Amino acid sequence: MSIGSMIRWLLAWAAALVVVWSFFEVGMRLWREHDPSDHRTRLVIMQWGDASEEQIVEGLKNQYEKEHPDIKIERIHANDFDPKLKTMMAAGTPPDLFYLNSDDLADFATEHLITNLDPLIADMPDGQKWLDGYYPVLLNAFRFDGHAAGSGHLYGIPKDFTTMLMYVNCDLFKQAGIAIPYGGWTWDEFFDDCKKISKLPADAAGRDYGAVFNAWPGMIQCLMRCYGGDLFNGSDFTHITIDTPAGIKALSVIQQARFVDESIYHSTGPQSGSYGEQLFYTGKVAILGPVGRWQTPHFRGVGQNDEGITSFHWDVVPLPHEQKAAVNIATVAWTMSADTKHPKEAMQLLRFLAGARGQEVVARGGMAIPSLRAVAESPAFLSGKPAHSQIFLDEVKDSYNPVFPSDPEFSQYMTDDISECLDLNQESPKQVAQDLSTDWAHEMASPLKTKQYPPMRWMPIVAATGLMIAVAVASVWLVSRRQKLGALDKKMERVGWLFVSPWVIGFIGLTLGPMVLSLLLSMTRWTAMTPMTTAQFVGADNYKEMATYDFQEHIKPALLVTGYYAALSVPLGQLAALAVAMLMNSRARGITMFRTIYYIPTLVGGVTMAAIWLWLLNPTYGLINHILGPIASKMGTAPPDWIGSDADRWAVPAMVMMSMWTVGGGMLTYLAALKNVPFSLYEAARIDGASATRQFFTVTIPMISPLIFFNLIMAIIGSFQVFAQVFVMTGGGPKNATLFYVIYLYRQAFQFHNMGYASALAWVLFLLVLALTGIVIRGSKSWVYYEGLKA
């Protein structure tokens, strides 16, 4: 046996052993988790958080196992917490206990995914006394009455929280001659102070800003409450009341400060918040807020690579008020799955995890406020910077938990609509308020929200599928029996089926099966947070919804954005790849190194590439605008804010520009095709007097036209499936400037939990791409030349 053959055999055996070991390891893992000799009660807990929070929960877990030898705890930490949790729930294997944000309570409680803790607490001898140790507003944040949070049954025990307030640069306040408002201030005073500070003389590092103001939906609601209004009239969330004097006032004062006074730092796009925080960190912003306690460790310098703020004196002040004080809070609780098999044991563990031990550690770290009064009011929380930490606790008396509809679509609607006013400055507050009211009214009137549907009948479908598979297998067996084959032919046929079986099984199980299932799901209403047995049959209503209001509001804009991107990226990408391949096809010295350099970017993952381009496209310190700045200034203009305030014009071209970074993949295939063009054809063309340009169009293009055709189809398909970069960089915003079709599909499936509607969107995308591919294939007959099919 030759060395080459030996290496191939070794690689084949190694691959086979890896596959076998993988299955064995998974099986052993399941066996270890369910070891029949281990009679301890097994509880699974799930959390998010940084390394310090992981360490806290791991320490609590070990301590509890030590004190309760009959309990075995498995801790799961997930950065992609929501997708993993919802996948586990849909699979019917949720963790017993897990973190739950107060914003998600209504969503989980409506779907009956979490346990009502009231009966379990009632069984405790000191249950009510234990609850009395927590701030009531926090407990109310995890009560749900079937319609809204704030009252009703208790579904979670808060582990920590934060009130929203303002971090201030005391030195800038002193320079502007403004007293630091420790005792409280109004919103009018806040905006006046911002104007005064923004007029301070600029230094070498640039001008100073009055504030970085976080105008998320919860903050708009808080501002409306201060002005005597609220987002909704009543707790049924059917009638939004932003189109009122309080709502218009809340939007107007922010728009005025950002775009007229320019006293508040404003930058749209995904890095606007982090860059604003960095400006505060470096002393160029006087007020950062409204934010919570989570900024404290960073400003203290607690992190491994954090130096903390040492160049100026910083502190915290209360949130401004107006007609009345209103302070929103953010809180997270330990909650119990509705499917836990050990509710009593899980409840005892929940009480321990939400107890004083862990909260004292969190308090000393400064990340959050303990939810237990005794710990929050102790030196563990109040000592250290900021000097006025007591303000966090004083704000509790005026605090409330932001209550939004259980439909996650509302937050997206509100974010998109107010973005046109507060981020893009394209619409007036009055118009934005009317748009949001109209959008929400249509959402509430949708048959998919109001109509009652029957359950999806899965058993007949499963039975029919099983019958079809049985008929197919029986047909193949009967045909093979009727064929009069010799022993050798039968053996060859069996070997053939053996070799093709991995593909057949994979195609049926991983491609055809999911396609059929998604087609069935497109006729259902299903959240994907519960087993598929809970799906409801809606018939063609998903498709009707797509063809009516949703088409104008979301689908049409998404198709226009995607089509615009495809129209630019497909031809430019193919031309760039072919041009680079022509250059790399030369015999110049060192050309191999250049081929490698051009190809390497294609190996970079989509998320990493998006992170790189976020920095490149940053309007303030990005490399691209740094290069374009001098050129633009000579033309009397400025470089665009690519994915920020100028996103409606420049976001898609920016995405196309980013796609050019990966032309190395196409270059490689074109280079291989160019190497296969017979040199004799070029010699014959030169003898006939053809110029280099004529040789390119009459020899090169026809000979590589099959590959051009293939790459064209793949590029069209790829351009309609752009996701990772856009999701990381913009999430589809601002407004709908980067709302690619697949981004909208993702929103429906995993943010709004409308998996049935998302499946319908996926089938429309499939048919659209299929139609475009068919058009290209039909048109290829006139320009694609196949050497093997020549006459």
Language model regions located:
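Hinge/lid segment of periplasmic solute-binding proteins
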Residues: 103-165, 311-318
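A structural signal for multi-pass alpha-helical bundles of membrane permease subunits
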Residues: 495-791
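Extracytoplasmic/periplasmic substrate-recognition and gating elements
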Residues: 72, 90, 148, 176, ...
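Glycine-centered hinge/linker elements that transmit conformational signals in sensory
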Residues: 193-194, 236-269, 319
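Short, solvent-exposed loop/beta-turn-alpha elements that line the ligand-binding surface or hinge
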Residues: 118-134, 183, 201, 229-249, ...
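Long, aromatic- and glycine/proline-rich binding clefts that accommodate carbohydrate-like moieties
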Residues: 314-317, 364-416, 420
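Extracytoplasmic/periplasmic solute-binding protein
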Residues: 144-159, 164, 174, 189-239, ...
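Conserved C-terminal helix/tail region of periplasmic/extracytoplasmic solute-binding proteins
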Residues: 3, 8-12, 16, 29, ...
